[in-house]
């Protein structure tokens, strides 16, 4: 059993992506999860399901380790996509980088926050009634113009503050 049989809210988090440049820092995911699931917030006491590909579990380890074991579950390629979709359909919110999992969340009908920096959110945002793109304070064009090279392995999500993401999530869930 992946999810607990409780009446608690469910927050699904996709803290990884296929390119480090568009991956929000683990520390920021940790802070956002803490704020959203904390006392008095919209997902107070939520169970957190972390999702990603099998080769992304190590990248997600800091986020996993920050959540008490009894408050979290994980799927990193160890379940079918149908199982992931069933979990997304039960979720109160999906929070993650622009990725295939973000698009699955939007398709499931789950309120979805997609995080964007070096991708054009106008093309790749979560397309659904409950989908929202939250992008860095820098535009796509400014990020691309200021990166080291087109093969850059630098993180390009530096200008996306936790407060902006949490505010968007609260508005969406409310």
Task: Locate predicted features.
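Short regulatory "switch" loops immediately downstream of catalytic or recognition motifs
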Residues: 1, 33-40, 136-145
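Donor-binding and catalytic core of enzymes assembling or modifying cell-surface/extracellular glycoconjugates
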Residues: 17, 26-117
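Short, conserved glycine- and acidic-residue-centered signature motifs
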Residues: 22-25, 158
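Mid-sequence helix-capping/hinge segment at a functional interface
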Residues: 1-21
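Short hydrophobic-acidic sequence motifs that mark active-site Asp/Glu residues
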Residues: 10-12, 33, 133
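Nucleotide-sugar donor-binding patch of glycosyltransferase catalytic domains
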Residues: 64, 74-75, 106-173
